[in-house]
């Protein structure tokens, strides 16, 4: 798809859920793929402690560190997955101070957000910002400057209101933008324009003449 369409780019990485199932030469394979001109990030990588059947934490951490080292070597940003692993995720990225990227679908505390922002990371906001029980999201948004915000959908999951419970769609990213714009007291169009620019800057994307709708 990235080869076929000018406005589609790719990221490559080993998600934490299959950690331990990778071939012995997986890092060499990732490095080869990451050198493709349309690959703009290493990801989605990280830690996932939510499911009991997920690989052991130590194994997930080992795979994560190896990929962060690859991102450092290739000077690529990271798309980070952190589910119920906030403490270990923060501790490990601190080991790689010259690697940054986006904590996608950020669910940590405002304090964690501030630490990541101080290290140069972006934070990704998605469907849960529209939920009535989203108590932490407004607090995180309050401490996150517009310059470090990205919007996403995490399709087909995390569907925003009023479509919650249905399959998510990338076009619903506008609903995320509208809620964040409300919290930031700015026009949705301003937030959409800003976050699109942030995404391009983070991923070093030179956009085609006509941009597709803003979505990550």
Model-found features: residue ranges?
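Helix-coil boundary/capping segments in enzymes
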Residues: 1-16, 28, 99, 198
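Divalent metal-binding pocket/active-site signature
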Residues: 16-119, 131-132, 139-140, 144, ...
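Non-cysteine beta-strand/loop elements that form the S-adenosyl-L-methionine
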Residues: 12, 40-45, 147-155
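Short, conserved active-site loop motifs that form the nucleotide-linked donor/cofactor pocket
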Residues: 7-8, 39, 121, 149
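Active-site phosphate/pyrophosphate- and oxyanion-stabilizing loops and adjacent acidic/basic residues
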Residues: 138-139, 178
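Mid-to-C-terminal alpha-helical segments outside catalytic/metal-binding sites
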Residues: 70, 170-216
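Short secondary-structure boundary segments
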Residues: 14, 105, 127-129, 153-155
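Short, electropositive alpha-helical surface patch
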Residues: 2, 90-103, 203-216
């Amino acid at each position: 798809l990235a080869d076929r369409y000018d406005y589609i780019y790719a990221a490559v990485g080993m998600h934490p859920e299959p950690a331990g199932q990778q071939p012995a030469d997986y890092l060499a394979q990732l490095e080869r793929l990451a050198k493709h001109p349309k690959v703009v990030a290493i990801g989605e990588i990280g830690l996932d402690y939510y499911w009991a059947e997920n690989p052991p934490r130590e194994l997930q951490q080992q795979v994560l560190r190896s990929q962060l080292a690859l991102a450092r070597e290739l000077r690529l940003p990271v798309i980070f997955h952190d589910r119920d692993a906030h403490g270990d995720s923060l501790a490990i990225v601190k080991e790689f101070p010259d690697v940054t990227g986006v904590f996608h679908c950020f669910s940590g505390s405002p304090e964690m957000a501030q630490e990541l922002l101080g290290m140069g990371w972006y934070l990704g906001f998605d469907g849960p910002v529209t939920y009535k029980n989203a108590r932490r999201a407004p607090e995180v948004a309050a401490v996150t400057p517009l310059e470090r915000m990205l919007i996403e959908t995490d399709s087909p999951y995390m569907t925003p209101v009023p479509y919650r419970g249905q399959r998510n769609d990338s076009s619903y990213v506008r609903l995320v933008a509208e809620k964040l714009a409300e919290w930031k007291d700015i026009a949705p169009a301003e937030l959409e324009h800003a976050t699109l620019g942030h995404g391009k800057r983070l991923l070093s994307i030179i956009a085609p003449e006509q941009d597709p709708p803003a979505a990550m």
